[in-house]
Amino acid sequence: MDPNCSCSTGGSCSCAGSCTCKACRCTSCKKSCCSCCPAGCARCAQGCICKGASDKCSCCA
């Protein structure tokens, strides 16, 4: 379990836009991918890396 998230690793949960999970692995949590991913990014992947600019990361360029 992520100490900052109430759901189990790899489980299904409803992480809201205000989710504070730092490494949330919830399959339904889109926010956990990256803080720099634009809203609605179809390729958003959990654990992607920000490249500096607020709108660029390793999965949504």
UniProtKB/Swiss-Prot annotation:
Residue span of region Beta: 1-29
Positions of a divalent metal cation 5 binding: C34, C36, C37, C50
Residues annotated for a divalent metal cation 6 binding in this entry: C37, C41, C44, C60
Organism lineage: Eukaryota, Metazoa, Chordata, Craniata, Vertebrata
A Pfam family assignment: Metallothio
Entry annotated with the keyword Metal-binding: yes
Domain comment as written in the entry: Class I metallothioneins contain 2 metal-binding domains: four divalent ions are chelated within cluster A of the alpha domain and are coordinated via cysteinyl thiolate bridges to 11 cysteine ligands. Cluster B, the corresponding region within the beta domain, can ligate three divalent ions to 9 cysteines.
Source organism of this protein record: Sus scrofa (Pig)
Residues that bind a divalent metal cation 4: C33, C34, C44, C48
Family: Belongs to the metallothionein superfamily. Type 1 family.
Protein name, UniProt field: Metallothionein-1C
